[in-house]
């Protein structure tokens, strides 16, 4: 399953990316997923875009429902209340 995730970040892309690559990616890969693309909006660098692949929506829901993962995202500057997920049809 491929999905697009958009959310606002407050600490800058480099801070987010450092956390994402060091902590989030290993967890996502361990769950059978991966990141296909990561970047910020060209006109607003506070808007992060990710294109991710996971085996199922259950995996996404497990990460989004994890209190520890949510706290880590917040520490990396994510405003979790702004997260929007769009499942992409192949």
PLM features: residue spans?
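Short S/T/G/P-rich N-terminal loop/turn motif that feeds into the first structured element of a domain
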Residues: 1-65, 82-90
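A common structural junction motif
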Residues: 27, 68-74
């Amino acid at each position: 399953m491929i999905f697009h995730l958009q959310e606002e970040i407050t600490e800058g892309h480099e801070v987010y990316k450092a956390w994402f690559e060091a902590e989030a990616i290993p967890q996502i890969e361990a769950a059978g997923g991966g990141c296909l693309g990561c970047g910020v909006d060209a006109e607003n660098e506070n808007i992060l875009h990710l294109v991710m692949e996971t085996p199922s929506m259950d995996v996404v829901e497990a990460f989004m429902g994890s209190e520890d993962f949510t706290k880590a995202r917040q520490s990396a500057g994510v405003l979790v209340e702004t997260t929007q997920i769009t499942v992409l049809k192949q």
